[in-house]
Design a protein with these regions (language model features):
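N-terminal lobe/hinge region of extracytoplasmic solute-binding protein
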Residues: 51-101, 132, 197
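Ligand-binding "clamshell"
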Residues: 144, 263-276
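Ligand-site clamp/hinge motif
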Residues: 219-264
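Gly/Pro-rich hinge or "lid" segments in bacterial periplasmic/extracellular proteins
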Residues: 84, 88, 174-226, 230
Length: 288
């Protein structure tokens, strides 16, 4: 189970605050036990300030890299498919898919209304561009089965062909990395990653590496629009400091574990309440 801590709202704004918190939690897709908190004080701007103890280094947030910023990956980059509320696989960039009887071929039918945050269209050509980059950067070995090739069937259909059955592919595509999608404008003239360009609900507005990242809604997002104007992620390593920030109203949400002895303090604070939700964990064995 994972735990959440949130402030009780004042002045009749409880429902509005709950919606803000629920949206941020959904975006974060936290995959481990954690405590969260939400500030009661209403702000003129619709801003949520969240804290994490992991390194915030968006300059390294290349979707094919295994950086620590998995929450940024979830907010900026979309997968072909994603986990639903009950652990079932749901459409994302792919609106539907077909699996061959032998489990070696997956055909994905892409949405036709998707654009990246810079306005670039997402389509089969973009999937092929990303696939070629996976090959060049030697990340296709992350699939549980050997990927033989990817083929463009038409402008919005792609086919993944494996050497043997890959029954876990949909689960693997739901992971934050390394198989999410960016576009050519994310790379500099030397082919090196230089900026975060994705199809997700959020895009980076500004950041101070190792300190904070400010995200704003992606104006080209194809799905439901967020009902907040800005998310500020702050890197706060010390657990006690995160608790104090929640109590003072400096921060709204804690996305990391806090000291166990602080749980009673949170429970005793009338401006804080706790929530529980089922978390998803993936276990795997690898051979040397």
């Amino acid at each position: 189970m994972s735990y959440a801590v949130k402030y009780k709202t004042n002045k009749g704004e409880e429902e509005m605050k709950k919606r803000r918190v629920a949206k941020l939690i959904a975006l974060s897709m936290v995959a481990a036990t954690l405590l969260t908190g939400v500030n009661v004080q209403a702000k003129e701007e619709k801003v949520v300030t969240a804290m994490t103890s992991i390194d915030l280094t968006p300059e390294l947030c290349d979707p094919i890299k295994s950086g620590p910023d998995f929450r940024l990956y979830e907010m900026i980059y979309d997968p072909l498919v994603r986990y639903g509320e009950n652990g079932e696989i749901k459409p994302a960039l792919a609106e539907s898919w077909d699996i061959s009887e032998d489990g070696t071929t997956y055909t994905f039918h892409l949405r036709k209304d998707v654009k990246f945050s810079d306005g670039t269209e997402f389509n089969a050509d973009n999937v092929m561009w990303n696939y070629n980059r996976w090959v060049e950067q030697d990340v296709i070995g992350n699939f549980s089965a050997k990927l033989e090739n990817v083929t463009k069937v038409d402008d919005y259909t792609v086919e993944f062909k494996f050497a043997e059955p890959c029954y876990t592919l949909l689960i693997e595509f739901s992971y934050p990395r390394p198989f999410r999608f960016t576009c050519e404008s994310a790379l500099d003239e030397d082919g090196e990653f230089c900026q975060e360009v994705g199809t997700g609900m959020w895009m980076i507005d500004s950041y101070e590496s190792g300190q904070e990242v400010v995200l704003v809604p992606n104006p080209n997002y194809y799905g439901e629009k967020p009902n907040i104007d800005k998310v500020v992620l702050k890197q706060v390593v010390d657990g006690d400091a995160r608790v104090m920030a929640l109590q003072s109203g400096e921060a709204d949400l804690n996305l990391q574990d806090i000291p166990s002895e602080s749980f009673s303090i949170i429970q005793a604070d009338k401006n804080l309440s706790t929530e529980q939700q089922v978390s998803t964990l993936s276990y795997y064995l690898s051979e040397n």
